[in-house]
């Protein structure tokens, strides 16, 4: 009897699985999109979900070698496409309707809720318009002062390991500096992460950005319904960390609202205006103030609305920048001719005083450093893949992508295509100087995405990268010490072996 029941249940399960996949399977077959062998129910999950974040990049690369620039993949009922084909990049990133992020972005939702990174539709359009004011050039000048101040703390903290012999994982130092920058820029508060890394908000944020990406590559934790059962302690830790972060952000918002209320009551409050010469002054918390005085359809943003956007800015402004800066320092350390050319540019543009503050205008004159940053993000894009979810059937060239398919544009491999970047594995910043004359396919290089959903904070990110990199190089010579990179894929590109360099104080500073 039990055997009959089990057999019947299995037949029903297989029939259900076949039925829900049938149309997508037929579409893939019609379009001849290749991929690994899929078994009933599990799909291809057993091939990938045991690899871990440190091995998935290599696995994806092997599949590109085997199947070409695009391959399909199944995990349970999820149909996915991985591609490095620029025709897919152009079609998807240029679309004004294909704006829903891939399924993996759902791991961000418990923390970011419906913030700009994961929202869609009218809400996304309205919030995006508000955010453009936060990156006005006058506001950016104020941010540069914040970046410069916290970068000085970073180089001071590096002194104790700058002996020319010790391999230093730069991500640990850069990440804390970036947290100090983004917390002050986003919320107008100083958490002093570089000297107090155990501050509760900082610990909670670091915990969340470790737990959630790790779930993508563990079958027992991948699904929200299974995660609390498979890892109850980790699940409770995640909920606790998110509560700590939300409580902190709520407290900052509440205190700022009260400050504004008192200013209005005594007649000293003056709303921000982009025509106001003082918008970049040190007295302004530009991002939070702009959100507090913003409205959509004549309705002011609620505390919950503001929190999810501040949290989004915190997430995107910490990990992505930290990855970019750390990988740049790693590459510079291993290319002494590049390092020397940057240093000469810094001396020429910023002057010999390593402690002198920098301005936005000076940073914009660092043309070669700009090329170094671009080349770093070509080889080591902080966001190694961009996801979109096709709710409806999609035509790309002669291919038909079935509805309910997540499509992942793998920047990590597209940026290494020899058709667009000769000698693609070589670190050669000059290729971006040459591109000013030669040009290249717009979608061959998209570290900040492209189209309507491109990164709205990219100018902020590049300025911060320039400030942090230039500050380190003005004080220290970088040396090629420590383990080589072992690229690790999660939301942000990391290295399982650390991002290591050695540091030696510049002669004038010894």
From Swiss-Prot:
| The entry's keywords | Endoplasmic reticulum, Heme, Iron, Membrane, Metal-binding, Microsome, Monooxygenase, Oxidoreductase
Tell me a GO cellular component: endoplasmic reticulum membrane
EC annotation from Swiss-Prot or TrEMBL = 1.14.-.-
> What GO molecular functions are on record for this protein?
heme binding; iron ion binding; monooxygenase activity; oxidoreductase activity, acting on paired donors, with incorporation or reduction of molecular oxygen
Span of the signal peptide: none
* Positions contributing to heme binding: 455
What is the protein's membrane topology class?
A: Peripheral membrane protein
- PROSITE patterns hit by this protein: CYTOCHROME_P450
Q: Which SUPFAM superfamilies match?
A: Cytochrome P450
**Endoplasmic reticulum in keyword set:** yes
Q: Which cofactor does it need?
A: heme
- Cellular localisation: Endoplasmic reticulum membrane; Microsome membrane
| Role this protein plays | May be involved in the metabolism of insect hormones and in the breakdown of synthetic insecticides.
The text of the family note is: Belongs to the cytochrome P450 family.
Alphabetized PANTHER family for the sequence: CYTOCHROME P450 4AE1-RELATED (PTHR24291:SF187), CYTOCHROME P450 FAMILY 4 (PTHR24291)
Q: What is this protein called?
A: Probable cytochrome P450 4d20
Q: Gene encoding this chain?
A: Cyp4d20
């Amino acid at each position: 009897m039990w055997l009959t029941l089990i057999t019947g249940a299995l037949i029903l399960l297989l029939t259900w699985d076949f039925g829900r996949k049938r149309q997508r399977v037929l579409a893939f077959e019609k379009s001849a999109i290749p991929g690994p062998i899929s078994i009933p129910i599990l799909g291809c999950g057993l091939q990938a979900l045991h690899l871990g974040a440190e091995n998935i990049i290599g696995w994806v690369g092997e599949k590109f070698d085997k199947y070409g620039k695009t391959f399909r993949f199944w995990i349970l009922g999820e149909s996915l496409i991985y591609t490095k084909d620029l025709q897919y990049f152009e079609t998807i990133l240029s679309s004004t309707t294909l704006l829903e992020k891939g399924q993996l972005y759902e791991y961000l939702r418990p923390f970011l809720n419906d913030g700009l990174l994961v929202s869609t539709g009218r809400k996304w359009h309205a919030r995006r318009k508000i955010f453009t004011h936060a990156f006005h050039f006058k506001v950016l000048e104020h941010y540069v002062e914040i970046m410069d101040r916290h970068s000085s703390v970073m180089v001071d903290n590096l002194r104790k390991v700058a002996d020319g012999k010790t391999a230093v994982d730069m991500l640990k130092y850069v990440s804390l500096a970036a947290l100090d920058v983004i917390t002050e820029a986003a919320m107008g508060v100083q958490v002093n992460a570089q000297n107090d890394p155990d501050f509760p908000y900082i610990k909670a944020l670091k915990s969340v950005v470790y737990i959630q990406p790790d779930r993508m590559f563990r079958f027992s934790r991948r699904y929200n319904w299974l995660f609390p059962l498979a890892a109850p302690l980790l699940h409770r830790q995640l909920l606790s960390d998110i509560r700590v972060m939300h409580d902190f952000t709520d407290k900052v918002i509440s205190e700022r609202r009260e400050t504004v209320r008192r200013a209005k009551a005594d007649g000293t409050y003056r709303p921000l205006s982009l025509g106001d010469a003082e918008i970049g002054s040190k007295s302004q918390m530009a991002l939070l103030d702009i959100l507090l005085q913003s409205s959509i359809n004549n309705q002011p943003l609620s505390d919950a609305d503001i929190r999810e956007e501040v949290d989004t800015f915190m997430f995107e402004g910490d990990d992505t920048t930290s990855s970019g800066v750390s990988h740049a320092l790693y590459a510079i350390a291993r290319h002494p001719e590049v390092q020397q050319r940057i240093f000469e540019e810094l001396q020429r543009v910023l002057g010999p005083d390593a402690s002198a503050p920098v301005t936005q205008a000076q940073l914009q004159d660092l043309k070669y450093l700009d090329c170094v940053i671009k080349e770093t993000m070509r080889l080591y894009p902080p966001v190694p893949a961009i996801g979109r979810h096709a709710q409806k059937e999609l035509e790309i060239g002669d291919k038909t992508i079935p509805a309910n398919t997540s499509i992942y544009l793998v920047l990590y491999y597209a940026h290494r295509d020899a058709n667009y970047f000769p000698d693609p594995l070589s670190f050669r910043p000059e290729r971006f100087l040459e591109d000013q004359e030669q040009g290249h396919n717009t979608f061959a290089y998209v570290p900040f995405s492209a189209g309507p959903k491109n990164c709205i904070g990219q100018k902020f990110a590049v300025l911060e990268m320039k400030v942090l990199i230039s500050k380190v190089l003005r004080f220290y010579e970088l040396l090629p010490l420590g383990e080589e990179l072992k690229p690790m894929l999660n939301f942000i590109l990391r290295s399982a072996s650390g991002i290591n360099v050695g540091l030696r104080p510049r002669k004038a500073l010894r």
